[in-house]
Amino acid sequence: MERITVTLGERSYPITIAAGLFNDPASFLPLKAGDQAMLVTNETLAPLYLDKIRHLLEQAGVNVDSVILPDGEQYKSLAVLETVFTALLQKPHGRDTTLLALGGGVVGDLTGFAAASYQRGVRFIQIPTTLLSQVDSSVGGKTAVNHPLGKNMIGAFYQPASVVVDLDCLNTLPQRELASGLAEVIKYGIILDGEFFSWLEDNMDALLNLDGKALAYCIRRCCELKAEVVAADERETGLRALLNLGHTFGHAIEAEMGYGNWLHGEAVAAGMVMAARTSERLGQFKQEETQRIITLLERAGLPVTGPREMSSHAYLPHMMRDKKVLAGEMRLVLPLAIGKSEVRGGVPHDVVLGAIADCQQA
């Protein structure tokens, strides 16, 4: 069992990583006998895990209700958020309830925002079931829903009480979802840890084959890196923005193509190549390092070009609505070397458009 702490003073919390955590009620601390909880999941995961976790917690004396959401990025919306509030109010659940987010990034982000908002804030626990949510979205307290004009535009910073990562969940994860998560894994190597990137080059086959030892190390390392960044910059005023490598381009793809048509990790993968090409055009990133990124993404089964039907100019309106925009100026996360990156403003639009075009034609 691996345990990492996200250090935020009185709001610090553990990330527990192991196989078989869904068999032990202690995994879900600080829940205890007599507590009330609302388990939020989706229609894909409910048949796999809902009854098991509910029975486990009820055996431990926790009173558990549940709400089952439709599955897909297009349901990360205010309308679906309202169904969670309705379920909480119908019982009713008070301020002493705990929300349990059992699912991937959509369930985790939406449930976290519900917890931040319901009666001005209730406790919640992240139970991520996808690789992407285990290494990224469940850690750090970013919660949100989408708006038709932009991804994650309505949300709050709100930290969970704990994060429970059961490695067994990955055994039921579709290959496309596994690859999507690997995009965020590769991102950590590019922006923060060149040695980890090299490890990924050596161990990608093991990860794709769900080797338990490789997965445990990979998830632990990603969570360590994320925890360090969040502890230093919880509200994304500086360092934490580096975690958005590829996301400014990627969010444009998701919004333009319709949420759910490109998985988040797929869009981020293409976006990271666009960021690398931008950095190349600025003379601060080597072409051979871009090729290393492309090769690793392709080995993971990820796209390295944008959608053919999306022109370069279609990206800019979405990118100008990005949350990193300041005083009307686009700011991009750009790699400087494998393991080192920066946030840079003032990149000429023609450079950005050229980099996107490079990726469309690759």
UniProtKB/Swiss-Prot annotation:
Keyword Heme: no
Cofactor(s) this protein requires: Co(2+); Zn(2+); NAD(+)
Family to which this protein belongs: Belongs to the sugar phosphate cyclases superfamily. Dehydroquinate synthase family.
Gene3D superfamilies membership: 3.40.50.1970, Dehydroquinate synthase-like - alpha domain (1.20.1090.10)
Cofactor binding remark: Binds 1 divalent metal cation per subunit. Can use either Co(2+) or Zn(2+).
Top-level lineage group: Bacteria
Organism: Enterobacter sp. (strain 638)
UniProt entry tagged with the keyword Signal: no
Protein name: 3-dehydroquinate synthase
Enzyme class at the top of the EC tree: lyase
Molecular function as annotated in GO: 3-dehydroquinate synthase activity; metal ion binding; nucleotide binding
Binding site for Zn(2+): E184, H247, H264
